Regions:
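N-terminal regions immediately upstream of nucleotidyltransferase
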Residues: 1-4
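Conserved nucleotidyltransferase catalytic core and NTase-mimicking acidic/glycine-rich helix/loop elements
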Residues: 119-285, 291
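A generic structural motif
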Residues: 49-54, 178-182
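Conserved NTP/Mg2+-binding pocket subregion across the NTase superfamily
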Residues: 55-176
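Alpha-helix initiation/capping motif
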Residues: 7, 25, 49-50, 69, ...
Length: 292
């Protein structure tokens, strides 16, 4: 319903526009369900223009958008919550990217990459661009979708391995032996979060917001379904230690399969150290595997 309106009353602006659904909100990942309908739910679209075009044409475009039908396929138009404003409708490209990555341009240095939260990179590259007549929005998007430079990815993998081994293979078991169940559950949560993160890295995909990370595993080709099943089974198991060990073995096998390490140790921290010291970058080679 938006495109026909542009073709009718905003035909001169149409060549400057990109249309899509990208950014915050579970609908951008395709994860909306009945529970999602209690806030920020309804038919919506993002319309992106360059900053100068946005300032020049925003009044005309917003006036045209006001005249669109208030329902679509039986659904009411988007009702924004207090925290859901400025996600949809008319947006300018510079501000959209700056909101998530702190710049209107893709990162060019290791330091710039490290400053951007990974969940922000996931958010700014999710969803779909339906039409990009000018190509400006997609040009930046594609550079971000090309993923981290390999040295950064390997450093992040090494850090995940250090944390997985610390939380799951070491501290979880020690906390259980001390009968400190609160601390043990803290360890288990941290273990699960780092395991999920590692699977995203092995798939060269940015890790998404924690609430949807488990669901997103099902969309990842490398170990996604297997790790999802092991984590689900572990949650319901009385004795979780065998699952911790199995998960670590599966991850170690995949790391060796991807030729990231040839270390045969069962302790993932050893693999993390090995990967870090073999990164083909002088800065990262001497960087702590505990840091990313």
């Amino acid at each position: 319903i938006v495109l026909p309106e542009f073709e009718k009353s905003l035909k001169d602006i149409l060549p400057l526009c990109a249309f899509g659904l990208v950014g915050e909100g579970s609908e951008c990942y395709g994860y909306d369900d009945e529970l999602s309908q209690d806030h920020d739910f309804g038919p919506s679209v993002c319309i992106w223009l360059r900053k100068d075009d946005y300032l020049k044409y925003k009044d005309r475009i917003n006036e045209a958008l006001k005249n669109l039908p208030k329902t679509y396929l039986g659904f009411q138009e988007l009702k924004e919550s207090e925290w859901g404003n400025n996600r949809r409708g008319l947006l300018n490209i510079d501000d959209f990217y700056f909101k998530f990555i702190g710049s209107a341009n893709p990162p060019q240095t290791i330091n710039n990459w490290q400053k951007i939260p990974e969940t922000a990179l996931a958010t700014v590259t999710n969803g779909e661009v339906f039409i990009d007549n000018l190509g400006e929005f997609t040009k930046i998007r594609e550079q971000l979708l090309n993923y981290y430079p390999e040295a950064i990815r390997q450093n992040k993998i090494a850090t995940r391995l250090m944390n997985i081994s610390q939380h799951g293979q070491y501290n979880y078991i020690r906390c259980l032996r001390r009968n400190d169940l609160v601390a043990a559950n803290q360890c288990l949560y941290l273990f699960v979060d780092e395991v999920m993160h590692l699977v995203f890295l092995l798939n060269r995909r940015y890790k998404i917001f924690y609430k949807w990370a488990n669901r997103a595993l099902l969309d990842l080709k490398i170990l996604g379904n297997e790790i999802h099943k092991l984590l689900e089974d572990m949650v319901f198991a009385q004795n979780k230690i065998p699952y911790v060990r199995k998960i670590c073995k599966v991850l170690a096998d995949e790391l060796r399969n991807q030729k990231l390490t040839n270390c045969e140790s069962e302790f993932l921290g050893d693999l993390g150290v090995d990967i870090q010291k073999n990164i083909d970058d002088e800065f990262f080679k001497n960087y702590s595997p505990w840091l990313d």
